[in-house]
A protein has these predicted regions:
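Sec-dependent signal peptide recognition
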Residues: 2-8
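C-terminal motif of bacterial Sec signal peptides marking the signal peptidase cleavage site
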Residues: 14-17
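N-terminal mature-domain "stem" immediately C-terminal to a signal peptide or N-terminal signal-anchor/transmembrane
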Residues: 19-93
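Extracytoplasmic/secreted proteins, especially bacterial periplasmic and envelope-associated proteins
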Residues: 44, 117, 121, 219, ...
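Sec-exported extracytoplasmic/periplasmic mature domains
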Residues: 50, 69, 73, 123-127, ...
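Acidic/His-rich structured neighborhood in mature extracellular/periplasmic domains
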Residues: 85-245, 315, 319
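Acidic/His/Gly-enriched intrinsically disordered linker/tail segments
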Residues: 218-282
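C-terminal soluble interaction/assembly domains
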Residues: 266-337
Length: 337
């Protein structure tokens, strides 16, 4: 009889644990399909630019100015500006990249569908904010200083050449580290779109206050990205390889124990910030198999735990600036491996 009682208690604990583990996921499954879909228009500026007759470039570029004002709002009577554009459109490396872009993005129906889904979910949460209805594909020359997705007042800009999956080893050719080029895939576009939406419309936080604050602020952003992309795997949300994701999940408790045990939770040291939040191939303090930005990963787990254990909405969580209240009520207690 005692064995049956103990077994019943154990099963109850397991079921309860599983239910709690899924609660935040349940909150992310919102019913947005009934909302009127915002029309998604995709315009290919790259194709238009690189298709121009370069023998008569000045006249040709003016013909597409009205269709692509976000790129061509300057004075096209300025010979210097025209020559700059012509130089870009005739650059052999840029032409090579554009040829890859045309092949990779020959059909944008799926992209439009994916963007529409992100828009609908965002409008479910924020019905009073209207996102731009035009998305532009363009070639940046794989400029590392330009965000892959940007939101402008009159359009969303997607640097299509940053989503080529290292085709023909193009990212290796320019010396891009593999930990960065692994994120240069079309499956990252809606993740980067959600990130751009967050930074444009939602985020008002100050970072590098202390480690815990940065963890939770990073966790808020990642949870928002997940909310707008509930089907994306954690590896894409975090920007990790599958191997790195496995390591993070397996050693989460050990990482947390090291942070707490070494009194880093409220640290303000720049070196500690770099170790926990800096982008790199791995986190040197742990293992060559570990991913970087483990502070962000822990932050996401804290927010997930907070959403699981508290009856709050996405907006309420994002608007809550009481870092310590979030941490205390999250009941975050990972187990060591």
């Amino acid at each position: 009889m005692r064995k049956i009682f103990v077994l019943t208690i154990l099963l109850s604990l397991i079921v309860t644990s599983c239910q709690n583990d899924k609660t935040y996921k349940n909150k992310l499954q919102v019913h947005y399909e009934h909302l009127d879909p915002q029309e998604i228009i995709i315009k290919d500026y790259a194709k238009a630019l690189f298709s121009l007759d370069t023998a008569n470039f000045a006249d040709e570029i003016r013909k597409i100015q009205n269709e692509f004002p976000v790129f061509l709002e300057g004075d096209l009577n300025d010979i210097g500006a025209v020559n700059y554009l012509k130089g870009f459109a005739t650059d052999t490396f840029c032409i090579r990249i554009n040829n890859m872009v045309e092949k990779k993005f020959s059909n944008n129906n799926k992209l439009a569908k994916d963007i529409k889904s992100v828009y609908q979910i965002f409008n479910y949460y924020y019905p009073n904010i209207t996102l731009p209805d035009v998305t532009y594909l363009y070639v940046s020359g794989i400029d590392p200083n330009i965000p892959s997705v940007m939101i402008m007042p009159n359009g969303i800009l997607i640097s299509a050449d940053k989503y080529l999956e290292n085709e023909n080893s193009i990212y290796d050719y320019i010396g891009m580290p593999r930990y960065l080029s692994q994120r240069c895939r079309p499956s990252y576009i809606t993740r980067d779109l959600a990130k751009a939406i967050y930074s444009t419309y939602i985020d008002n936080k100050q970072y590098q206050k202390d480690v815990l604050t940065d963890m939770i602020n990073a966790g808020k952003e990642l949870y928002f990205i997940e909310a707008l992309n509930p089907s994306l795997p954690d590896s894409i949300i975090m920007g990790y390889s599958s191997k790195q994701m496995t390591w993070a999940e397996e050693y989460e408790g050990d990482v947390w124990a090291a942070i707490v045990g070494n009194n880093m939770l409220y640290a303000k040291n720049a070196e500690i910030f770099r170790s926990l939040f800096g982008d790199a191939p791995f986190t040197q303090a742990f293992s060559n198999d570990s991913p970087a930005r483990l502070g962000e990963y822990i932050g996401l787990q804290i927010i997930r735990s907070y959403m699981t254990n508290n009856d709050v909405s996405l907006q309420e969580m994002l608007n809550n600036n009481d870092i310590h209240q979030i941490f205390q009520t999250s009941q975050y207690k990972p187990r060591k491996s």
